[in-house]
From Swiss-Prot:
Its EC number is 2.5.1.145. The lineage of its organism: Bacteria, Pseudomonadati, Pseudomonadota, Betaproteobacteria, Neisseriales. The keyword Transferase applies. GO terms for biological process: lipoprotein biosynthetic process. One of its GO terms (cellular component) is plasma membrane. It comes from Neisseria meningitidis serogroup C (strain 053442). NCBIfam families: lgt. This is Phosphatidylglycerol--prolipoprotein diacylglyceryl transferase.
Length: 283
């Protein structure tokens, strides 16, 4: 079993100011978005100009931050924040939702498109290939922080990783499983899936490769965005089987996690959109 290195979440600290790895992962994601966006402009495969790309980035950042935070509040810990509403503003304590951030970016795309006279689906198609590497960067941030770890796996599995940060969850899990209790007593922690790395590979690298390559040719309007939508939903749904469910939610109906249920509409809309838009002539 590999032991998580327990990286210091703070990269640089100068007096009261601290630069955290997780914040850096977001910044890297926005840099990658801009870099890929400029490549697409140079290839003639974008509705952006260099100036409008920089303008949209501001809209996108606001969509990610506000949507991600609001999504976390509504989807994951609504009752807690309802009891302590001021905690919503404590973003430094963590708590962001991809699905909320996605909805925030969709709203930003709609508003930006209206302002600049760009069709919503055309703009979605342009933005979609630029996003996955940013998601990959975010998952590396999760791994460095030692958060969002995976479910318990076999002690002899080559991928098994112990997370010292999961001490409380390990104790709770071992209390209901004699074999896990034995492992915990012997090794001091339980072997878990490094699910952050699975999500890095699936939602980040694989999704980027699929959407980027598919969008290198002109496609029917809406089809690239649909591929991203369905692709992310499928990869996230799969990865969630290895990810530890949120302790304050657990597994929901049919034994699925909140992340899986939120991904189901993405999968359905993505598949329907991909087929429907693909049947239309390119325009």
């Amino acid at each position: 079993m590999i032991i998580h290195p327990q990286f210091d979440p703070v990269l640089i600290s100068i007096g009261p100011l601290a630069v955290r790895w997780y914040a850096l992962s977001y910044i890297l994601g926005f840099i990658l978005f801009t870099f890929l966006g400029r490549r697409r402009i140079a290839q003639g495969l974008s509705v952006f100009t260099k100036e409008s790309l920089d303008d949209f980035l501001t809209w996108g950042i606001l969509g990610v931050i506000f949507g991600g935070r609001l999504g976390y509040v509504l989807f994951y810990k609504f009752s807690d924040y309802l009891a302590h509403p001021l905690d919503i503003f404590k973003v430094w304590e963590g708590g962001m939702s991809f699905h909320g951030g996605f909805l925030g970016v969709v709203i930003a795309i709609w508003l930006f498109g209206r302002k600049h006279g760009i069709g919503f689906l055309k703009l979605m198609d342009t933005v979609a290939p630029l996003v996955p590497l940013g998601l990959a960067s975010g998952r590396i941030g999760n791994f460095i922080n030692g958060e969002l770890w995976g479910r318990v796996t076999d002690i002899n599995a080559f991928w098994a990783m112990g997370f010292p940060q999961a001490r409380y969850e390990d104790l709770e899990a071992a209390a209901h499983n004699p074999l896990w209790a034995e492992w915990l007593q012997q090794y001091g922690m339980l072997p878990r899936h490094p699910s952050q790395l699975y999500q890095f590979a699936l939602e980040g690298i694989c999704l980027f490769a699929v959407v980027w390559l598919f969008s290198k040719k002109q496609r029917p309007t809406g089809q690239v965005a649909s591929l991203f939508l369905g692709g992310y939903g499928i990869f996230r749904f799969i990865a969630e089987f290895a990810r530890q469910p949120d302790d304050y939610l657990g597994l929901l109906t049919l034994g699925l996690s909140m992340g899986q249920w939120l991904s189901v509409p993405m999968i359905v809309l993505g598949i329907v959109g991909f087929v429907r838009f693909g049947m239309k002539k390119q325009h």
